[in-house]
Amino acid sequence: MPKLQGFEFWSRTLGGARHVVAPMVDQSELAWRLLSRRHGAQLCYTPMLHAQVFVRDANYRKENLYCDVCPEDRPLIVQFCANDPEVFVQAALLAQDYCDAIDLNLGCPQMIAKRGHYGAFLQEEWDLLQRMILLAHERLSVPVTCKIRVFPEIDKTVRYAQMLEKAGCQLLTVHGRTKEQKGPMAGTASWEHIKAVRKAVGIPVFANGNIQCLQDVERCIQDTGVQGVMSAEGNLHNPALFEGRSPAVWELAEEYLDIVRQHPCPLSYVRAHLFKLWHHTLQVHQQLREELAKVKTLEGVAAVSQALKLRCQEDMSRQQEGVRPADNLPAFHWICQPYIRPGPREGSKENSGGRSKRALEEEEGSMEGLSKNKLKKQLRNPHKTFDPSLKPKYAKCDQCGNPKGNRCVFNLCRGCCKKRAFRETADCPGHGLLFKTKLEKSLAWKGTQPGLQEAQQVRPVTPSGFSEVVGSALA
């Protein structure tokens, strides 16, 4: 069967998908994809896979793709990060029989992508991207797609998209933020950029960004003219987003746990999903947050889910008519709803009106107001002091400024002490360095071995550079 392209690929292979679950590292695993498909998702992406590791490691391929084969999990697009055309194509060839298309990640803005030189940090290397897409388009039996972020300039974003289309990209997902817009600085995605790209290319376009409910999906399609809308954060907080429903948080949690029992995944994935799904409820019942963080088994997670369900039902029974949700939430905490990420100014020290936590610790010498991580450490180590005023003060090394050993005979740190003791053939019992003692023992032992002494005695060297002993041996 010939490889379908562009709109024919979108309409026939992908079934004209409009509701799409984004590729999310450690989050869009098989169990979550199946849950999302049950609630309106028409197309899913795998988590981003590292192309080089996928080619090199058979276990990585097995754990991240080959063991996750499920007839219900189609259509499916496998996403790779890569910066080498040959490696990208080799990985894609190994994956193409398990999916409907291969996607190249050109949108990841995280520091790990910068260090690895992939994702959004390739967006200025157009020649490299052209070679990667062209080679994949020529050699794969399935279409190649791309997920990108925008440039600040609309015209440059349009030229970028047209370059990828010309190289062989058959479907383009446009995240309407720049690579600098992330975390607290995420801001609002630009649908104007997405609209301009959609008008300028002749392939299907998916929009990504600012999608928190079904109304956002419909408005985005209407405003930009895209073929589909991709959701990441919104999907994590409400997997029923594409149905236009906001069910109780425990309802979707129980359904997800049932799927995980059939299609197991690492417990860290499960825990991360429930932290997102229960975000607002865990602000109210913080003890459950601690319990969820501690459990080590799926049964333990299910027990926490049951406890959360009972707490929420108690809150519902006490809820009085006419009372609005707390903290300006659009719905009560037990209802699936979007999470609005605080802006950079909301959490800044300038607006907090207080001093840093470390300064307060040093002044008060108390554990109040510390982070949960430090409180956990205190519980695990009850005899350890966290009061800075009680911590021992270390004198500095005379040479490098690092803390010196309290019992060092040279008043140095271990590194400097080792160099000096070796140079002077001296001992430092404080650091356990016994160069002098070991040398004396070695000489004393050799003195008791007359045969060894004779073997080590070398005769005068001949003009040719070899000792007479060596010369006679070669004769």
UniProtKB/Swiss-Prot annotation:
Query: What is one GO cellular-component annotation here?
Result: nucleus
**Which reaction is the catalytic activity of this chain?**
5,6-dihydrouridine(16) in tRNA + NADP(+) = uridine(16) in tRNA + NADPH + H(+); 5,6-dihydrouridine(16) in tRNA + NAD(+) = uridine(16) in tRNA + NADH + H(+); 5,6-dihydrouridine(17) in tRNA + NAD(+) = uridine(17) in tRNA + NADH + H(+); 5,6-dihydrouridine(17) in tRNA + NADP(+) = uridine(17) in tRNA + NADPH + H(+)
One Pfam match, by short name?
Dus
In which residue ranges is the amino acid composition biased (Basic residues)?
373-383
Sequence similarity: Belongs to the Dus family. Dus1 subfamily.
| Source taxon at top rank | Eukaryota
Q: Which GO terms describe its biological process?
A: tRNA dihydrouridine synthesis
Q: Where located?
A: Cytoplasm; Nucleus
Asked whether the UniProt record includes Zinc among its keywords, one would answer no
Binding residue positions for FMN: P23, M24, V25, Q79, K147, H175, N208, G209, N210, A232, E233
Q: Which GO terms describe its molecular function?
A: flavin adenine dinucleotide binding; tRNA-dihydrouridine16 synthase activity; tRNA-dihydrouridine17 synthase activity
Query: What is the protein named?
Result: tRNA-dihydrouridine(16/17) synthase [NAD(P)(+)]-like
Which residues lie within the region annotated Disordered? Answer: 343-388
Cofactor(s) needed:
FMN
Active-site residues from the entry:
C108
In terms of PROSITE patterns, this protein maps to: UPF0034
Which organism encodes this protein? Mus musculus
In the UniProt record, what gene is named as encoding this protein? Dus1l
Q: What broad class of enzyme is this? A: oxidoreductase
Q: What does this protein do?
A: Catalyzes the synthesis of dihydrouridine, a modified base found in the D-loop of most tRNAs. Specifically modifies U16 and U17 in cytoplasmic tRNAs. Affects the level of some mature tRNA and thereby the total cellular translation.
The enzyme's E.C. designation = 1.3.1.88
